Amino acid sequence: MSQVLGKPQPQDEDDAEEEEEEDELVGLADYGDGPDSSDADPDSGTEEGVLDFSDPFSTEVKPRILLMGLRRSGKSSIQKVVFHKMSPNETLFLESTNKICREDVSNSSFVNFQIWDFPGQIDFFDPTFDYEMIFRGTGALIFVIDSQDDYMEALARLHLTVTRAYKVNTDINFEVFIHKVDGLSDDHKIETQRDIHQRANDDLADAGLEKIHLSFYLTSIYDHSIFEAFSKVVQKLIPQLPTLENLLNIFISNSGIEKAFLFDVVSKIYIATDSTPVDMQTYELCCDMIDVVIDISCIYGLKEDGAGTPYDKESTAIIKLNNTTVLYLKEVTKFLALVCFVREESFERKGLIDYNFHCFRKAIHEVFEVRMKVVKSRKVQNRLQKKKRATPNGTPRVLL
């Protein structure tokens, strides 16, 4: 396997003006024998504030993800491996969580949400515990079950948690991670998932709650299954997901690409992919490619004094596999990357792919520019509402 990393050369001004005038994707039938188009981005003059997704959002518009489960089920290990790049072997030394740990996943990545890690022994249904406040602002509830332990108690706790949460907020996505499956055989994995699925849904049916939908995932921190499961959880919280999938479908159909992922490079969560099925091996190759690009860029991409960033708007990578497949990575935004699977014969039309990528990249920026405007508008409305509450009838409230 050969690896090529590099940054494209700046584009001539005349070429940039021509691309500025044409913003439609070019189909394979329209491809000519002219020179390859450059990788340079004509939109480099766009305001950085629009593209910088590290701006922390208010809690009113940021989804909340709850991590729940019994003690030693692996909740904290999942959080550390996915969002803190901790080695799975190091999680063996993590202490049990004895209080609710809240973390913002927003200042280092495009993916914006809060994670609340609940200790297994806490009774959050205690009368002194405001569980309604917690569930009211929740987008997804992840319940972690240790597949290598007796899970009858976990299923009882799952049923209690889901029924209480559903009464408060019917819009919560309920996700069940059947965790630590790395120690099980393939047959045992399937049997365990079937048994947990059957028992959990039977309990809901007996309680007359057939409307509640539970999603089940087989996960382990020792492979990429936990990243794929978290990707699917986060995707449900992204309102722009149908638009992103549609853009990816248009891009690959016009560029001769077999598969494309839109990755968050910090967490290796893919926030969108095209409509073709996701193969686990394909996803693992994408994750490995991102690691290679970031690691090599950290070594060779920084200045002698350590200044600069290992990943920027000119970042690109090409990895040719020994099965005539090419992996192609391109920067989309500050924390987003597009990873494509292309056949070698299709990659000969690199100019077409790069031009269509420019159109795709511009569309992504426009989608999230609208998103930023909506968020800012909500912030302004919240401030106005607070001011109205603070000054009833035009008289400032005096705090005693």
From Swiss-Prot:
Effect in UniProt of substituting I221K: In HOMG7; increased positive regulation of TORC1 signaling; increased phosphorylation of the downstream molecule S6K1
Catalytic activity: GTP + H2O = GDP + phosphate + H(+)
Region (Disordered): 1-54
Extent of Acidic residues compositional bias: 11-25, 36-50
Binding site for GTP: R71, R72, S73, G74, K75, S76, S77, T91, T97, G120, H179, K180, D182, I221
Gene Ontology molecular function terms on file: GDP binding; GTP binding; GTPase activity; GTPase binding; molecular adaptor activity; protein heterodimerization activity
UniProt entry keywords in alphabetical sequence: Cardiomyopathy, Cytoplasm, Disease variant, GTP-binding, Hydrolase, Lysosome, Membrane, Nucleotide-binding, Nucleus, Primary hypomagnesemia
Outcome of substituting P119R: In HOMG7; increased positive regulation of TORC1 signaling; increased phosphorylation of the downstream molecule S6K1
Activity modulation: The activation of RagD/RRAGD is mediated by a GTPase activating protein (GAP). In high-amino acid conditions, activated by GTPase activating protein FLCN that stimulates RRAGD GTPase activity to turn it into its active GDP-bound form. In response to amino acid depletion, the GATOR1 complex inactivates RagC/RRAGC by securing the GTP-bound inactive form.
Stored CDD domains: RagC_like
A Gene Ontology cellular-component term: cytosol
InterPro entries recorded: Gtr1_RagA, P-loop_NTPase, RagC/D
Keyword Nucleotide-binding attached: yes
Principal cellular location given in the protein's record: cytoplasm
Result after altering P119L: In HOMG7; increased positive regulation of TORC1 signaling; increased phosphorylation of the downstream molecule S6K1
Binding site for GDP: R72, S73, G74, K75, S76, S77, T91, E95, T97, H179, K180, D182, S220, I221
One BP annotation, GO: cellular response to starvation
Entries under PANTHER family matching the protein: RAS-RELATED GTP BINDING RAG/GTR YEAST (PTHR11259), RAS-RELATED GTP-BINDING PROTEIN D (PTHR11259:SF5)
Protein name as annotated: Ras-related GTP-binding protein D
UniProt organism field: Homo sapiens
Gene behind the chain: RRAGD
